[in-house]
Amino acid sequence: MRNVSMTQRISEVVRNTNETKIRVRLNLDGTGQGTLNTGVPFLDHMIDQIKRHGLFDIDIHCDGDLEIDDHHTVEDCGITLGQAFAQALGDKKGLRRYGHFYAPLDEALSRVVVDLSGRPGLFMDIPFTRARIGTFDVDLFSEFFQGFVNHALMTLHIDNLKGKNSHHQIESVFKALARALRMACEIDPRAENTIASTKGSL
């Protein structure tokens, strides 16, 4: 019998285009370690929330065309991280599949719900109070999340329920995402060799 809990769930993805060159290494059963170097400091800060609060080991290195703007780097990092999750999850046997979490950060409160369904879908409502956080264009978060869900093959609901500070709004989202992903990616010891779907596949 296959013991899923003892299987290494580790992936490494390299994605090279004319716009970005990215390498991602992911361990789903880590301790929140890793080095992030996307070239966009605020994106590093947000992915660090996934790493630390999800207890995923994540290494990302990206060389992107930042002389143009951050768009390609942010979107492509989402794509490549999504590919790494899909690869590390493998056949999805034993997964809890669903995860949800509410995360506060001072006045901000966000809810994230994850379904590792195999069906990409992003449903996102973040009423940002300003257009930029420092130099970072908040519109790019939808590009990151869309790339992530499309390639991780998951359904993702993101709702910022309260918030006045845009930094707090998005950081609470990433913290909630981290915990929801952690829950969804965990192995259910009572169902180690089954798929959490009546179809028998995800």
UniProtKB/Swiss-Prot annotation:
Its EC number is 4.2.1.19. It catalyses: D-erythro-1-(imidazol-4-yl)glycerol 3-phosphate = 3-(imidazol-4-yl)-2-oxopropyl phosphate + H2O. It comes from the Bacteria. One of its GO terms (biological process) is L-histidine biosynthetic process. Keywords: Amino-acid biosynthesis, Cytoplasm, Histidine biosynthesis, Lyase. It is found in: Cytoplasm. Gene3D superfamilies: Imidazole glycerol phosphate dehydratase, domain 1 (3.30.230.40). It is an enzyme of class 4 (lyase). SUPFAM superfamilies: Ribosomal protein S5 domain 2-like. Its main location: cytoplasm. One of its GO terms (cellular component) is cytoplasm. Belongs to the imidazoleglycerol-phosphate dehydratase family. This is Imidazoleglycerol-phosphate dehydratase. It comes from Acinetobacter baumannii (strain AYE). The gene is hisB.
